[in-house]
Regions:
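C-terminal catalytic/motor cores of large multi-domain enzyme assemblies
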Residues: 3-148
Length: 148
């Protein structure tokens, strides 16, 4: 997802950065600011930045430049109670990851994930490998890693 489709010039643009859009539900509507260079940050730093930009959105204190330049977006309906859904890609981004509500199934926790992606830019097999790697990284020790 370091790519984007240039509709006007029919080109594929390779990005040298990975900015993640985070969908934030506010009383003013949905806002999708970006966490810049997310691939080079520790999980603890991402968590702090997520809280900061979410608060800025809710208080209308965020600079509008924070809404541009995303590589992909992460959206969650878990807090509202949604499980599986099909998130819609925010052009010119090429993918969006939807996170549902954690549910308990047979004494195990399950986190529903839905990945939508632009097949013109992202190969379906690569998307499946991404989902498998994400699943592996969210394995048993994930909650422990977050608490460090």
């Amino acid at each position: 997802v370091y790519k984007r489709q240039d509709e006007e010039n029919y080109e594929l643009i390779l990005k040298k950065y990975f900015h993640i859009g985070i969908a934030v539900d506010t009383e003013h509507g949905l806002m999708v600011p970006k966490i810049r260079n997310a691939d080079s940050k520790k999980i603890e730093d991402l968590s702090i930045e997520l809280k900061d930009i979410s608060e800025k959105c809710r208080n209308l204190k965020i600079d509008k430049k924070e809404f541009f330049g995303g590589s992909m977006t992460i959206t969650s309906l878990g807090g509202i109670g949604g499980t599986f859904f099909t998130p819609i890609i925010n052009p010119p981004e090429v993918a969006i990851l939807g996170i549902g509500k954690i549910v308990e199934r047979s004494k195990n926790l399950m986190l529903p994930l839905s990945l939508s992606y632009d097949h013109r830019v992202v190969n379906g097999a690569d998307a499946a490998r991404f989902c498998n790697e994400l699943k592996d990284n969210l394995g048993q020790n994930f909650a422990y890693k977050l608490s460090l």
